[in-house]
Amino acid sequence: TVRVPLISMFGASNELPEDDSLNALHDRMLFRFMVNNVYDASNRMLMYNGFLERRNPKTNKKQITTITIEELQDINHAAKFVVIPKNVLNQYDQLLMTLETSNQIVVTDRRKNEGLAVLQASAILEGRDVATVDDFRYLTSVWWQRPEDIKVVYEAIMKVVNPYEAK
């Protein structure tokens, strides 16, 4: 057995898990995106050609990594030092409670905690060492459990991020 650190994991599926035994695994998929099929003909052609180019040994170009493992580790380390001020943490908690009590959207404790790491990472990537409510915008892809929750979660978060636009 060779132990290897899991740095990141990406997955794709045509359906969401319905079997309760998969809930713990699904809960660990932090960012979630719903993507529709490609309906536009020109975009489908781009998709097909890209697939065929990647499969062809004559045209297949080596994938270029845009960030090194060391850079990723540095970002992860720096994010741990980002301060989340008490007022931001209070708004974070209030938003979660609003989702639960007003909208019956339950965010697991794991996702509540990992959401804080998302705020810290957002701040670092924006060049800040303090998280703000503006960082909440990334939680729109973290806090939903069912597709029907997506819009509700998005609107609740945007009311906090940009209260004047939401009115």
Regions found by a protein language model. Give the residues of each.
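Conserved AAA+ ATPase small/helical "lid" subdomain
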Residues: K58-G115, A123
